[in-house]
Design a protein with these regions (language model features):
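Solvent-exposed loop/turn and edge beta-strand elements of beta-rich ligand-binding domains
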Residues: 1-185
Length: 185
């Protein structure tokens, strides 16, 4: 009598940022190769990446499977790439790397005359601070990261900011106007 044993392998992966640093806490799923909805409920198995970004799916049966991120870490964009893996040999280990990009954003504002709001004002300087201690208030622990650039008359912006909270404070008023003492989040 011949006994057939099922073939099982594993998928070993690493979750990293754009610089190759490991990211812990991301939810990864193993899905049937005919799945089209990549949710935690549809996953055959799930794993959470460790502090170093590593994750493992063990005892994955013979066949074709999909690996996909289900939930990224806060501040990172969901990687929607579907990784096709094939378990074809007993104790086979398939290795993959899932890269996440940081969420980036922009700050844009328009400086206008308080009395004549259709009149845009040029020549102001706005400092941008990162809320380094994440307390929601501009204080001495916050980092000055630069100033807004005036792109057009009265229109100021800063692009490609990493995920987080920022404050904008006018440091120089346009000629003939008083400084706005407000801090804007």
């Amino acid at each position: 009598m011949t006994e057939n044993k099922l073939i099982y392998g594993s998928v070993s992966g690493k979750k990293v940022d754009e610089n190759g640093e490991g990211l812990g806490g991301a939810l990864i799923g193993l899905f049937k190769s005919d799945d089209v909805e990549f949710t935690e409920e549809n996953a055959l198995m799930t794993a959470v990446s460790g502090d170093d970004g590593s994750f493992v799916f063990e005892n994955v049966p013979y066949g074709n499977w999909y690996i996909r991120e289900i939930k990224p870490l806060t501040g990172f964009v969901l990687n929607e790439t579907v990784y096709d893996v094939n378990i074809s040999e007993n104790e086979q280990v398939v290795e993959i790397e899932i890269v996440n990009k940081l969420v980036r954003g922009n700050i844009a504002l328009t400086k206008v005359d308080a009395e004549y709001t259709d009149t845009k004002l040029t020549g102001a300087v706005f400092e941008v601070y990162k809320d380094s201690n994440d307390n929601g208030e501009l204080d001495s622990e916050d980092e000055l990261i630069g100033t807004l650039t005036e792109k057009e008359i009265g229109q100021y912006e800063m692009n490609d900011l990493l995920y987080g909270r920022y404050f904008v404070k006018e440091s120089k008023a346009p000629e003939g106007f008083t400084l706005d003492e407000g801090v804007y989040e």
